[in-house]
Regions:
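Residue-level signal for inorganic ion chemistry
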Residues: 18, 40, 51, 83, ...
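N-terminal subdomain of lithium-sensitive/metallo-dependent phosphomonoesterases centered on the IMPase/IPPase/PAP
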Residues: 1-80
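An extended, acidic
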Residues: 137-250
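DPxDG-like acidic metal-binding loop motif
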Residues: 70-132
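Short loop/edge segments at beta-strand edges and connector loops
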Residues: 62-64, 131, 170, 215
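Generic detector of well-ordered alpha-helical packing
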Residues: 41, 64, 79-82, 113, ...
Length: 250
């Protein structure tokens, strides 16, 4: 088994565990008023344990356990990205695991168990959906029926003056995976942490998309292994980035 094969198998098992809770959880509120469930905690515990067995010595930074990391290589885990969807019975939620080395995501897997899509990527090797290669859009025309993904807070804060349609799916990683497979022309993300980004980042990059800071257009070259909030980000194929940045009012 390669590291990527092992990661895919782990994320699939974690997704099945999450699915066993789906439709029967009672959420509690975190200090920031966002939801957390017994499923989030159980999935993160499972991933911490299994990653520790398969990749001994590599630290884990996760959303639900308030513990930092000390080295420059770590697994970054979001046990359920889209907890509000999960609680409400909306099937757009995912288990996300990425490996960050010296600030760069190098391996990633994202699994949507409720509809069976598993995305994976390895730096320099490509990106796949359920084992088939995927690629972001390569044309340069933004059409009326094209889709631009916005995170929940982006929708509340931004005006979009582009001919396309807007989709806010309630999970940050969807902006990355749906850009990677060519479903979205881009995705705009605000108020995210590294665990929202790491796995999706390598998938989108390997599929031909770029990740830039929305305000400046500067490439986002490194991800911090901290719990800090990240700047507003845009993920999109390079040919769409100038148009999208021009068409979005912060």
């Amino acid at each position: 088994l390669t590291d990527l094969d092992a990661l895919i198998a782990l994320v699939r098992r974690a997704g099945e565990l999450a699915l066993s809770f789906y439709g029967r959880v009672v959420p509690s509120e975190k200090p920031d008023r966002s939801f957390v469930t017994e499923a989030d905690k159980a999935v993160e515990e499972f991933l911490r344990s299994e990653l520790g067995k398969h990749f001994p010595g590599v630290e884990v930074l996760g959303e639900e356990v308030e513990r930092g990391v000390e080295k420059s290589v770590a697994w970054v885990v979001d046990p359920i990205d889209g907890t509000a969807n999960f609680v409400a019975g909306v099937p757009i939620w995912a288990v996300c695991v990425g490996l960050v080395e010296e600030g760069t995501p190098t391996l990633g897997a994202v699994y949507y168990p409720a509809f069976g899509e598993l995305y994976a990527a390895q730096q320099g090797k490509g990106a796949w959906l359920n084992g088939n290669p995927i690629h972001a859009r390569t044309d340069d025309d933004i059409r009326r029926d094209d889709l631009l993904g916005l995170s929940t807070l982006s929708v509340k804060r931004m005006q979009v003056q582009l001919p396309c349609k807007i989709r806010s799916l309630g999970t940050a990683v969807a902006c990355f995976t749906f850009v990677a497979k060519g479903s979205f022309i881009g995705g705009i993300l605000t108020d995210n942490r590294v665990w929202d980004i790491a796995a999706g980042w390598v998938i989108a990059k390997e599929a031909g998309a770029e990740v830039v800071q929305l305000r400046t257009g500067e490439p986002m070259t490194k991800l911090p292994l901290t719990r800090e909030s990240l700047p507003h980000l845009l993920v999109a194929p390079p040919q769409f980035i100038p148009r999208i940045r021009e068409g979005v009012r912060l």
